[in-house]
Amino acid sequence: MTPTVHTWPILETARTQVLEQGIGLTEDQLVEVLQLPDEALPQALELAHQVRLRHCGEDVEVEGIVSIKTGGCPEDCHFCSQSGLFDSPVRGVWLDIPELVKAAKETAATGATEFCIVAAVRGPDIKLMNQVKFAIGRINEEVDINIACSLGMLTQQQVDQLAGWGVHRYNHNLETARSFFPQVVTTHTYEERLETCAMVKAAGMELCCGALLGMGESLHQRAELAAQLAALEPHEVPLNFLNPRPGTPLENQGLMDGKDALRAIAAFRLAMPRTVLRYAGGRELTLGDLGTREGLLGGINAVIVGNYLTTLGRPATADLSLLVDLNMPIRELQKTL
């Protein structure tokens, strides 16, 4: 006799609404996904994977990141060791242009199609903008790779300059839900982040706007964030999981439960069926090797390879080998601008 397979109403709803119709789940529906019991998790991940394949295709986008300016940031993001306001071990360092070009070449050699230049600042000054301009020019001369930037909050003039220099994608994370944001950042507002995101989209650059989960937010606030990101319609959403850093206000927060992280991956995919959903920081500790594999079979379709800004990632070879094992092709480089 064949055993009965239990089904959950929210997953049946998602199968019709998201998989078949391509309509993301609402905030209330996402809460139901995040509250699913552990025994429902394999079905949720399988459905999220089917959604990814149908609405995004089978390719996986690989990206490398490097910091042009590390540490000394004047903002007080409670999770970040690059803040100059906390007693953390990260100190201010600038990276010169030859080092950036070298990093871009190494990134391209892994098969990555995107290289992101990051700076720990509230927003770029003239010195930083000039350095970014020269770096973009040199990288384009020597490396065939899309260039992205993450330089904090921008003015309209800076947005126009970056677009004019050929920046393919701009990263500016919401990080957490509007209702939780004041508990993790007080030196700028949620609305200021949204303003930069809106200008980036209006200028024709792709918007990369991500989340950092595990900072003490509730399940309802995770659903709120997923819905707010879906409303923003970014091209890409990096999913980060808190890696508590010494000297920051969240150093004792602890790691997010791995199954909760997988539930969140499925929920974010069901909220945004057509968005690039990228593995980013903290997954090594939160999910480990097995969880990383499960996430790639549960809605993820992009990865950052190598190290992050202030923490170590998985070796690029480990991620690339895993993609080969899962028969997931790496997206070929396409210049879109």
UniProtKB/Swiss-Prot annotation:
GO molecular function: 2 iron, 2 sulfur cluster binding; 4 iron, 4 sulfur cluster binding; biotin synthase activity; iron ion binding
Domain of life: Bacteria
Enzyme Commission no: 2.8.1.6
Cofactor note (record): Binds 1 [4Fe-4S] cluster. The cluster is coordinated with 3 cysteines and an exchangeable S-adenosyl-L-methionine. Binds 1 [2Fe-2S] cluster. The cluster is coordinated with 3 cysteines and 1 arginine.
Enzyme class: transferase
Cofactor(s) in the UniProt record: [4Fe-4S] cluster; [2Fe-2S] cluster
Residues the record lists as binding [4Fe-4S] cluster: 73, 77, 80
Pathway(s) the chain acts in: Cofactor biosynthesis; biotin biosynthesis; biotin from 7,8-diaminononanoate: step 2/2
Entry keyword set: 2Fe-2S, 4Fe-4S, Biotin biosynthesis, Iron, Iron-sulfur, Metal-binding, S-adenosyl-L-methionine, Transferase
Catalytic activity from the UniProt record: (4R,5S)-dethiobiotin + (sulfur carrier)-SH + 2 reduced [2Fe-2S]-[ferredoxin] + 2 S-adenosyl-L-methionine = (sulfur carrier)-H + biotin + 2 5'-deoxyadenosine + 2 L-methionine + 2 oxidized [2Fe-2S]-[ferredoxin]
GO biological process, one term: biotin biosynthetic process
Start and end residues of each Radical SAM core domain: 58-283
Keyword Iron tagged: yes
Chain positions recorded as [2Fe-2S] cluster binding sites: 116, 149, 208, 278
Cross-referenced InterPro entries: Aldolase_TIM, BATS_dom, Biotin_synth/BioAB, Biotin_synthase, Elp3/MiaA/NifB-like_rSAM, rSAM
Protein family membership: Belongs to the radical SAM superfamily. Biotin synthase family.
Protein's job: Catalyzes the conversion of dethiobiotin (DTB) to biotin by the insertion of a sulfur atom into dethiobiotin via a radical-based mechanism.
Subunit record text: Homodimer.
Entry-linked PANTHER family: BIOTIN SYNTHASE, BIOTIN SYNTHASE, MITOCHONDRIAL
Protein name per Swiss-Prot or TrEMBL: Biotin synthase
Gene: bioB
